[in-house]
From Swiss-Prot:
Molecular function GO terms recorded: structural constituent of ribosome
Stored Pfam families: Ribosomal_L31e
Record's protein name: Large ribosomal subunit protein eL31
Keyword field contains RNA-binding: no
CDD domains: Ribosomal_L31e
NCBIfam families: PRK01192.1-1
InterPro entries named in the record: Ribosomal_eL31, Ribosomal_eL31_CS, Ribosomal_eL31_dom_sf
BP-aspect Gene Ontology terms: translation
Assigned protein family: Belongs to the eukaryotic ribosomal protein eL31 family.
GO cellular component assignments: ribonucleoprotein complex; ribosome
Keywords associated with the record: Ribonucleoprotein, Ribosomal protein
Length: 89
């Protein structure tokens, strides 16, 4: 998907500690939203135009819904059309 167009790549380390303030049954969902918000802030794009790779999703959900990792290292690829992809480095 990213090979076809001109792209910009960014390596980020996103802290997900504030997801611990949400209820236990919604921590993984909150972490995905926080991840998208952080990427939207750095790439200056809309949150709806951000695509999360399946491996990143599996990393956040790896220990279940209640025990999310506190920090995630990701690679963001911003495409020319304004969409962004979140993948593992």
């Amino acid at each position: 998907m990213a090979d076809e167009e001109n792209t910009t790549e960014i390596l980020l380390s996103v802290s997900l500690r504030k997801a611990r303030f949400s209820s236990k049954s919604r921590r993984a969902d909150t972490s995905i939203k926080m991840l998208k918000d952080a990427v939207a802030r750095y790439t200056k794009s809309d949150r709806d135009r951000i695509w999360v790779d399946n491996k990143v999703n599996e990393l956040i959900w790896s220990r279940g819904r209640r025990k999310v990792p506190t920090r995630v290292n990701i690679k963001v690829i911003k495409l020319e059309d304004g969409t962004s992809e979140i993948i593992l480095p």
